[in-house]
Structure formats: C-alpha cells, structure tokens
Swiss-Prot record:
Enzyme class at the top of the EC tree: oxidoreductase
Protein species of origin: Nostoc sp. (strain MUN 8820)
Protein name per its UniProtKB record: Nitrogenase iron protein
Keywords of this entry: 4Fe-4S, ATP-binding, Iron, Iron-sulfur, Metal-binding, Nitrogen fixation, Nucleotide-binding, Oxidoreductase
Function of the molecule: The key enzymatic reactions in nitrogen fixation are catalyzed by the nitrogenase complex, which has 2 components: the iron protein and the molybdenum-iron protein.
Protein EC: 1.18.6.1
Residues annotated to bind ATP: 13-20
GO molecular function, one term: ATP binding
Subunit structure: Homodimer.
Amino acid sequence: MTDDNIRQIAFYGKGGIGKSTTSQNTLAAMAEMGQRILIVGCDPKADSTRLMLHSKAQTTVLHLAAERGAVEDI
C-alpha cells in the first residue's frame, strides 16, 4: 500500500453524540467491503476500541508510551 492509498477519517465532538457508534459502524462496513482499517481511540475515559472487543481491557496509547518512551520515540 502506498501513501497515496491511505485515507484518514476523524470523528470528533462533545460527549454523547454518537461518535463511537458512528465510527464503529463506518469501520465495520469498510472492513466488510475489503478495506484494511485501523481504529485509534484516544479517549482515556471511554476508549471506543473496547466496544469492538466486548469490554476487554486493552493496552492503550498511554500505556505504550509509558513502556516505550515518548510518543515521538515510538
């Protein structure tokens, strides 16, 4: 995959407006169409990736940075 093929989508806004639901449904549809997708949840209080993983605790960006150094170093 070249950089020309990479697309980024951001969902943002105040809490409770459906960002997680919209992002999960959009990405699920894209995956079903054969697209390779990556979701990065950056809300330390309500990370949307746990919705896809049935509330299983996952390593977060904050944990990764704490283990490996600054985000810029990763």
